[in-house]
Amino acid sequence: MANRYDDNSIQILEGLEAVRKRPGMYIGSTDTRGLHHLIWEIVDNSIDEALNGYGKKIQITLEADGSVTVQDEGRGMPIGQHASGVNTLQVIFTVLHAGGKFSSEGGYKTAGGLHGVGASVVNALSEWLTVEVAHDGELVRMEFADGGKKIGKLEHLGKTNRTGSTVRFKPDPRIFSTTEYKYDVVCERAREEAFLLSGIAMVVSDKRNKKNETEKYLYEDGLTAFLEYLHEDRNVLMNPVKFSGEANGIQVEAAFQYTDDYQENTYSFVNLVRTGDGGTHEAGFKGAFTKAINDYARKYGLLKAKDKNLEGGDVREGLTTILSVSVPEGLLQFEGQTKSKLGTPQAKTAVEAVVSEKLSFWLEENRNQSDTLVRKMLKASLARIAARKARDEIRKGKRVGKGEKVLSGKLAPAQTKDARVKELFLVEGDSAGGSAKQGRDSHYQAILPLRGKVLNTEKCTLADIEKNEELNTLIYTLGAGVGPDFDYKESNYGKVIIMTDADDDGSHIQILLLTFFYRYMRPLLEQGMVYIALPPLYKVTKGKTTEYVYSDQELDALRRKLGKVEIQRYKGLGEMNATQLWETTMDPSQRTLIKVGISDGVKAERRVTVLMGDKAELRRKWIEDNVSFTLEDTFDLEG
């Protein structure tokens, strides 16, 4: 019988019910990323207070019971009667799109919390939430439970001389796949906010263990400190340059610094909200920066009349930029609820005006350094032309039969043509590759053995990559281009799974491949298309029963349970036959995969720098401290 679709099929979701029904629409996901997003929905409100001159400290506490407390020194949320007839505090926490940031009369000149859904969404997705507010001499409290239902009335706690808001909430385990917060993730984000809020302290405390850890982040020259933090383990070519200005009522603050790397990195913010997908402000910065450089180069003869202008990629090779703009509420436009891309047209012209004036002045005042930078850019231009030819060969296979030759005898392709379901296993070694080819489901699983040495691409150009057989093969196999031309939508595979031995060499191959993906196919990571397979460490046998174990802790528990057992330690994938490899590592119903993503671009950038940069001692120490080749500690750009 077909499902009926009539008048009774139409549902109206009341209040916060819509948030619980479709949480991804409001916080992006219900995994660890969405979980941490709850904190920042509340913190953003506290930051908006600080941004407008109210308060010098924001405290975030991970409580022992799994809840989170956010406390600020702002004016305190309004606690009187709202025009709707309900207490204003209740309106803030139970009504979507209720807030003081929708008009210039709302109490905020600039604010990141534009949509007015932050507090109510956190309430909707919490097991319980309490809010205490010190406002106009009064201290009050209101409590909610079970997805935002108010408990009792507004409680008056007495008089107070302080001001501010304290929100404590516990995420609902019925909504989230995990409710355990990562202290280091919260600290990284708090540090980032402190860089942008010069003079404002961000404090993070963890009361969940005996250490009772606390970190305080306070910077007087935030953007310069931000660059120094990012480049702590890099070779810089100059001191940080910082400038600020205002145009069209929009405040612009920027800092930049060159390193000896080939990649560019831009970290942009609007009203302290990270815009990971860029937007009009980034476009304005990049356009004005490139124009100022070209104007300078032509003025002083570094570019001749017959020469073409330097392109943006030439100018920004090795450039790290921090761009922070403050946009008045009346002009603020984000594309989407997650606020990852700015859409305000006026921001582009404002940033262009400030950057054009300030950068042109700096170039003139620092002629020797400016000339050195332009000569570096001219070399980058020549390398770009060579790399473009290499990319054309990679993408189009200009040499006759080159694509077939590259893949010949290596790739065991999948039968299906549906890229969405296809999986590409990158397997360490020929022997394991052979077992994987025999054990796989050939309908949708393809195997590409890695035979030679994978290149460390942290210090390479695209021309270097084109000469490396293993990476060249991988690029052809994925079929989506490389570098600036890469388009994840063109990928021949929906999943790319790295499958290596659980030892030092296997870990190193993982890191080399992840570095390549991060530098030259980053959208694969951003879209969650890259995974690490976890093969078992042990085969445990007792009688006719066999179990596979993935960590030493799991082995100890199994030995206590079963008593005397026979244990086989797998030193490599090649020690498993085709059936065992399928059952333990490749079968979707049995295997364990770790998705490698980028939840924190700053942290990912620093981690890749440490692991793959030219400072071997830092790399050795990080691997010793962080990698034990178990389920818990596999390399992950998110972690």
Regions found by a protein language model. Name each.
Residues 79-98:
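Short conserved segment of the HATPase_c
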Residues 48-49, 76-77, 504-505:
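Residues immediately C-terminal
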Residues 21-40, 109:
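Conserved short strand/loop->alpha-helix "switch" segment adjacent to the catalytic nucleotide/phosphoryl-transfer site
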Residues 52-54, 79-82, 437, 509:
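Conserved ATPase-coupling elements of RecA-like P-loop NTPase cores
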Residues 26-33, 78-84, 176, 276-277, ...:
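Flexible beta-alpha connector loops of hexameric P-loop NTPases
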Residues 1-9, 16, 40, 48-50, ...:
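GHKL-family ATPase ATP-binding module
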